[in-house]
Regions:
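Glycine-rich loop at the start of a catalytic domain that most often binds anionic cofactors/ligands
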Residues: 58
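Glycine-rich flavin
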Residues: 63-82, 231-239
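Flavin (primarily FAD) cofactor-binding/catalytic cores of flavoenzymes
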Residues: 2-47, 51-53, 82-383
Length: 383
């Protein structure tokens, strides 16, 4: 259990101000603001250690953004500001951030249900329960690994991993590897695997950031990209409202590992995997690949079925406006992809969104009793 676990625990009859569910960068950033507002809060995280969401990813992963953009509110990221931190450095930073500000994080807590009893929210995790006036969903959108139905028809001899399970090539069987998915994770994992295995990557290209990734880009290009991601490609601008749905459907452009890098490493590139025939993957052009391993870099499904509140559209989409769930006063969300901007699930994005959400929560807290709705807080001029 985390060293911060002594701060707050479930107590019968005690009503907290806020329960934040999720102790990654989004939950920690917002928690920092809420503690500064002198709120009685707890941050619940399913992992055994703060930062494990990063720590448990593939070994060679580095952040796409330079360190000067990777800090959270109140604590700059240490070290080389133009360098690109490893996933372990990012994990350790988050752990240090929670300790530095004394954030009341409880680790190893798997929330089963969020509901309501009377005026308060109830958060259940096994035999434990918390009551609160506010709940923040900070679990992101990467809940359930998504793989196609036909994956189950691959031959038993084919080793299958989702990108969330991949750490390094020692997990793989001898023989060719097929990486399914041509996004950033697919490209990076394919390049990693190609050092020891014959590798093919399958999928539709998502485009590329047309600059070479490195220190020069960190100095001159990423400040422009960051500004656009924070202030232009948002639902608050006409261009953002047009572009964001397309970006959400199409996927992010390749940032560090480009098609030319894959070609230089000898990685074969093919079209989409559309089926399985005789236990082998079938490509859109009808060709069949004989491989010993498949790594599914096919993303995740959102799963908020444990939130037992009238906060969703018919298709299960959370109804929120910049993190505020107006249909359920006191319910908020942060760190979700495209929640407000293209950067909403990134480190720079959660820093911006956490400050905004904390202002909204403060406005609701101080609103007159007759104006308790989130709409009333919005009309009070919170921006």
């Amino acid at each position: 259990m985390d060293e911060n676990n002594h701060h707050t625990h479930s107590e019968p009859g005690r009503v907290l101000d806020t329960v934040v569910i999720g102790g990654g960068q989004a939950g920690l950033a917002l928690g920092h603001h809420l503690v500064r507002q002198h709120r009685d809060i707890v941050i619940l995280d399913a992992y055994d250690r703060v930062g494990d969401a990063w720590r448990l990813r593939w070994d060679s992963l580095r952040l796409f953004t330079p360190a000067k953009f990777d800090g959270l509110p109140g604590l700059p990221f240490p070290g080389d500001r133009l360098g690109f931190p490893t996933k372990d450095e990012q994990a350790d930073y988050l752990e240090a951030y929670a300790a530095h500000f004394g954030l009341p994080v409880e680790t190893g807590v798997h929330v089963d249900r969020v509901g309501r009893i009377g005026a308060h929210f109830v958060v259940d995790a096994g035999a434990r329960q918390w009551e609160a006036r506010n709940v923040v969903l900070a679990t992101g959108g990467c809940h359930e690994p998504r793989v196609p139905e036909f994956a189950g028809r691959l031959a038993a001899s084919v080793r299958q991993l989702h990108s969330s399970e991949y750490r390094n090539a020692t997990q793989l069987r001898p023989g060719p590897v097929l990486v399914v998915g041509m996004g950033n994770s697919g490209a990076e994992i394919a390049l990693d695997v190609s050092r020891s295995h014959a590798t093919t990557v399958a999928g539709t290209p998502t485009g590329e950031l047309p600059v070479r990734h490195g220190r020069a880009a960190a100095r001159f290009v990423f400040p422009v990209v960051r500004f656009a991601g924070l202030h232009v490609l948002t639902f608050g601008t006409p261009i953002g409202r047009r572009a964001l749905p397309k970006l959400a459907h199409h996927g992010d452009p390749l940032i560090r590992t480009k098609a030319a890098d894959l070609d230089a490493a000898g990685v074969a590139r093919v079209g989409r995997v559309v089926d399985v025939r005789d236990g082998k993957p079938v490509i859109a052009d009808g060709s069949v690949l004989d491989v010993a391993n498949v790594i599914w870099c096919t993303g995740f499904r959102d799963d908020l079925t444990w939130v037992d509140l009238p906060a969703f559209d018919d298709d299960g989409t959370l109804r929120q406006r910049r993190g505020v769930v107006e249909s359920v006063p006191g319910l908020y969300a942060i760190g979700r992809e495209f929640m407000y901007a293209v950067t909403s699930a990134t480190l720079p994005g959660v820093s911006r969104d956490s400050a905004y959400l904390a202002r909204r929560m403060r406005a609701r807290r101080t609103a007159p009793a007759s104006a308790t709705s989130e709409t009333a807080a919005s009309s009070a001029g919170v921006r």
